[in-house]
């Protein structure tokens, strides 16, 4: 059994299934060490992750691993040890743990410096603070893979990328605060990390803190419980750049909003940069205090939108270049057409497809992709459009009469659009072959099956047809949305 392939397939499923912040926080850094006598040994990078996996995700891990290996497994989580090496193919962030810890630790002061005038100095860390350091590293972690160079730019995110680059090049001079908002998995977190990585690459002495609003809230609660609120304020206010993710979660939390209000004021008045992300605009966060809302609107507010087909294709192509197995362009086009949501799901699906192909030692094809993603596609497809909408859109795209499309004509200018309609009706609706045949002039199910198979085969080799089908799908999605 190839543990690398098993774990990569499991991670692909979990990346699609779990919210982004949960996957990145709890699952991404874990590794599979062995499966023996029905027990899977999963290694956690630290005690915090180990506790979280055991308390929250054991059932999910059992289910997903069992689904991949084909038999029930129990899961035991162990703590990382120097005696073990990360196995080949495990997800990693491209840098050694030592370098990563150095980089992230230096971005967050843990103790007050010798100066009280707001100037940041490197702060000394002592062994008794080791547990505190681990917690700080987690909350300030910058993923070195998330850089501007690796961010795929399209019409949906061009302004957001430009604004973040301006902030990274001239902190607290361009837009302060910068507020990014948009749905999950659209690249907001990538851009926040990219700002931090860009700044630290230019000047490692800059104090950069990336943190989620949930972590901010938990740190505040813990500091109150331990009577360490002053240490909390030093930690969050003695920095140069604050990158705070998912700010919408502080809405309705009165004490958290109070503390963040004063943190914001302290940083802003000291000329420090603040970058905020949210799943909605400040005005749409209903239980957000007005004084915070008004401050969020001081700078620039940028909407990050859903990626279009061209951007989805570019994202998948860039991801495929890092794949251990070749991913042909027809498969990239297929995934870009079928996964019409967010970037996280796109990447998770590609990971699952390539791991599936590795596990069964087969090349990546559209058929393999369909098999690997069968559960996801069955869940997501057939729910956006109606058969009538498909017929109308196909007729309009090919400039043919709808009655001719549904009639008995066998002329070539009708046959190809009709076969495309058969294919889309089969792929995008719950219609049976017989029902599709009735919609298209009373044809029998074997004729419909032939038409669907013919289009499926030609999509592998005909770039023009792929583009035509993709365009029709885009129009259907927009009209249904």
Curated annotation (Swiss-Prot):
The keyword Nucleotide-binding applies. Oligomerizes as a right-handed, spiral filament on DNA at oriC. One of its GO terms (cellular component) is plasma membrane. Belongs to the DnaA family. The lineage of its organism: Bacteria, Bacillati, Chloroflexota, Chloroflexia, Chloroflexales. This is Chromosomal replication initiator protein DnaA. SUPFAM superfamilies: P-loop containing nucleoside triphosphate hydrolases, TrpR-like. The gene is dnaA. Domain I is involved in oligomerization and binding regulators, domain II is flexibile and of varying length in different bacteria, domain III forms the AAA+ region, while domain IV binds dsDNA. It comes from the Bacteria. It is found in: Cytoplasm. Residues 71-140 are annotated as: Domain II. One of its GO terms (molecular function) is ATP binding.
């Amino acid at each position: 059994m190839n543990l690398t392939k098993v774990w990569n397939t499991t991670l692909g499923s979990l990346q699609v299934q779990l919210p982004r912040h949960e996957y990145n926080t709890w699952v991404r850094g874990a590794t599979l060490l062995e499966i023996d006598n029905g027990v899977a040994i999963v290694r956690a990078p630290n005690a915090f992750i180990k506790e979280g996996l055991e308390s929250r995700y054991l059932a999910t891990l059992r289910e997903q691993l069992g689904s991949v290996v084909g038999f029930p497994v129990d899961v035991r989580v162990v703590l990382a040890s120097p005696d073990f090496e990360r196995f080949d193919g495990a997800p990693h962030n491209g840098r050694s743990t030592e370098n990563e810890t150095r980089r992230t630790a230096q971005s967050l002061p843990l103790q007050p410096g010798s100066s009280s005038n707001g100037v940041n100095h490197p702060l000394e860390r002592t062994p008794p603070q080791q547990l505190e350091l681990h917690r700080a590293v987690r909350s300030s972690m910058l993923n070195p893979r998330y850089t501007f160079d690796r961010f795929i730019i399209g019409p949906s995110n061009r302004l957001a990328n430009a604004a973040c680059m301006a902030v990274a090049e001239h902190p607290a001079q361009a837009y302060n605060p910068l507020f990014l908002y948009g749905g999950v998995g659209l690249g907001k977190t990538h851009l926040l990390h990219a700002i931090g990585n860009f700044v630290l690459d230019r000047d490692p002495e800059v104090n950069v803190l990336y943190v989620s609003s949930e972590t901010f809230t938990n740190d505040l609660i813990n500091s109150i419980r331990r009577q360490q609120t002053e240490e909390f304020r030093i930690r969050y206010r003695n920095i140069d750049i604050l990158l705070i993710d998912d700010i919408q979660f502080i809405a309705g939390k009165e004490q958290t909003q109070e503390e963040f209000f004063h943190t914001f004021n302290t940083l802003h008045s000291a000329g420090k940069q603040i970058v905020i992300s949210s799943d909605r605009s400040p005005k749409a966060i209903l239980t957000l205090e007005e004084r915070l809302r008004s401050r969020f609107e001081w700078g620039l507010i940028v909407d990050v939108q859903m990626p279009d087909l061209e951007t989805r294709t570019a994202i998948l192509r860039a991801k495929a270049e890092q794949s251990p197995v070749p991913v042909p362009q027809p498969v990239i086009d297929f995934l870009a057409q079928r996964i019409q949501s967010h970037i996280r799901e796109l990447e998770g699906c590609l990971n699952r497809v390539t791991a599936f192909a590795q596990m069964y030692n087969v090349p990546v094809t559209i058929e393999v992709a369909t098999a690997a993603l069968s559960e996801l596609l069955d869940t997501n497809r057939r729910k956006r459009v109606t058969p009538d909408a498909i017929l109308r859109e196909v007729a309009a795209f090919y400039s043919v009469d709808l009655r001719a499309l549904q009639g008995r004509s066998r002329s070539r200018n009708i046959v190809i659009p009709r076969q495309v309609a058969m294919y889309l009706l089969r792929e995008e609706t719950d219609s049976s072959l017989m029902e599709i045949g009735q919609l298209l002039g009373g044809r029998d199910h074997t004729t419909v099956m032939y038409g669907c198979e013919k289009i499926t085969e030609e999509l592998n080799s005909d770039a023009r047809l792929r583009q035509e089908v993709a365009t029709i799908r885009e129009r259907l999605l927009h009209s249904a949305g």
